[in-house]
Amino acid sequence: MAGTFPPKISPTLMTPDPHFIPGYSGFCPQYRYSLGKTYGQLTSQLLTNPDIRRSELLVLQSNPFPPPRDHSFDGGSQELGGRRQHPGDPNLTISMIPGYTGFIPRSQKFFAKTYAETSRDALSDFHSERRGQEAQRQELLLMSKLQEGRLPRTEQEKQLLASRHRTPLPALAKEPAPFMALRGFQPQGSPYYMEEENPNKCFISGYTGYVPRSRFLIGSGYPITTNRAMVEFAHMNQKKGVRFSEGYKEGGSPHTEPGQIYLEELGLLPRYTGYVPGYKFQFGNTFGRLTQNALGHSTLQKQTVN
């Protein structure tokens, strides 16, 4: 019974090397002209056939064991910026495997190389920069201690440039003096009630409120567009004989009348989500036409108006 089954490592159960595994999307010579076998057996036959011209350097090489991982960088195994060493396998090593989706510092500066070379050069550059920053920090710390007299000076340190002032400098006052602007901000009111020649008659970029007639103007910046829209809106209201209250200039409400929602001369703006008497029974006209003088006309009068 034991002689019926082949051994575990045999050409019957395992495809002999060299061969390509299924899913390999690279080029294999004469593969498109061969058929009748599995992908592994067919590529193994093509790669070992002496009659087929192919490159002497194989793309895939057999390597039963992964290469030893080297966790050392140029300049020794110093920690980055004084970071505490932690147990376990570090993520950033000198032999990075392609397909790693984590962040590699300085990798954007290197190109035209393989992933492993780019990762190695980027991490070496990053370590060198951090070591330089650590050296500068130690130098500043040493100079601070020397200026404060906490360390005895050597002959070389006595030749360093010395400051005339001791650090930290003493404070002249406990609290800073209050700052008062010479020309404080003065609110100028709503742009709707400004004169047409006023340069502030516009809305700044980023304003998300509704500006009448602005959707029909294109090709200019937002302040210029809103200025032209409000001027055009004012001219349209003048032709209709609608005048807005000037009480807002004196600190009053910006509306025509406080608490008034349904106007007699104008309809409501589109997308108004409030209640309009009799609107649900009307059709055949725009929202503004149907909501004009909502409290004065009956449903039959609104359907026959205009």
From Swiss-Prot:
Specify where the region named Disordered lies, as residue ranges. 61-92
Q: Where is the protein localized?
A: Cytoplasm, Cytoskeleton, Cilium axoneme
- According to its record, what are the GO cellular component terms? axonemal microtubule
The record's account of tissue expression is: Expressed in airway epithelial cells.
Keywords linked to the UniProt accession: Cell projection, Cytoplasm, Cytoskeleton
Q: Carries keyword Cytoplasm?
A: yes
> Keyword Cytoplasm: yes or no?
yes
- Give a Pfam family name: CMI2B-like
InterPro entries registered for this protein in UniProt: CMI2A-C-like_dom (IPR018902)
Q: What is its main location?
A: cytoplasm
Give the source's domain of life in one word.
Eukaryota
What functional role does this protein have? Microtubule inner protein (MIP) part of the dynein-decorated doublet microtubules (DMTs) in cilia axoneme, which is required for motile cilia beating.
Q: Which family does it belong to?
A: Belongs to the CIMIP2 family.
Protein name in the entry: Ciliary microtubule inner protein 2B
Which species is the source of this protein? Xenopus tropicalis
Taxonomic lineage from the root: Eukaryota, Metazoa, Chordata, Craniata, Vertebrata
